[in-house]
Amino acid sequence: YLPQGLLPVEILDLPGPLFDRLGADPGPLRRTAPADPSADQSLVSVILPVFNGAEVLGTALRGLRAQSWQNLEILVVDDGSSDDSLALARAAARQDARIRVLAQGRNLGAYPARNAGFSAAQGAFITVHDADDWSHPQKIELQVRPLIEEPELQATVSHWLRVGNDLQMARWRMEERWVYRNVSSLMLRAGLRDGLGYWDRVRVNADTEYYYRIL
């Protein structure tokens, strides 16, 4: 992160494995922001689909709630979980008014869950965050600022690194690299939803298809 000019990552004094304790202090960034975070920040909707993700959901939400870009709508879409995911999401929503919970009632799959969040999203920009991911506090800001500053730009993505609970890096494929384009983090202008439609209701890789649909 440091070579990219980002805040350094630290291990927080929290229980659990190292991955669940990742953090970075966005305080220096927030102290330069106005008292009303929506005053100069467009609303970004973050769709967070979850299915039986009670063990990981808290880490994902903690990362989103700590974003330097504070004007967020966090849409947790529970896809018919049989564990405590829905209860945990509702508890988080009681603590943070930016969190909204949508309950599917039964398991429909990852992309129907994303589509439910897509339909409900009210932000000027919309993105997705997987339930088992952690995001650096500057992630949302670094994706949305180019969209605001360059009106002709339609979408942005981030990059990801796969690690285990002990933060040991692991390769996703048999390739000589560690960092990959994160098409599931696609952030787009809300207007594209009307022009391009929703994710295909398939089991895998609909996010990649949507990425190329924009191209």
Can you name each region flagged by the protein language model?
Residues Y1-Q41:
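Non-catalytic membrane-proximal stalk/linker segments that position and tether the catalytic domains
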Residues S42-I47, E73, E209:
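Cell-envelope/extracellular polymer assembly enzymes that use nucleotide-activated donors
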Residues R62-N71:
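Short, acidic, metal-binding catalytic loop of nucleotide-sugar glycosyltransferases
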Residues D78-A87, R106, D130:
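A conserved acidic beta->alpha catalytic loop
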Residues A103-A121, L142:
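Glycine-rich, basic loop-to-helix element that forms the pyrophosphate-binding segment
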Residues I126:
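Short aromatic/hydrophobic "clamp" motif used to bind/position activated sugar donors
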Residues W134-W172:
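Conserved donor NDP-sugar-binding/catalytic core segment of glycosyltransferases
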Residues M174-L215:
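Conserved nucleotide-sugar donor-binding catalytic segment
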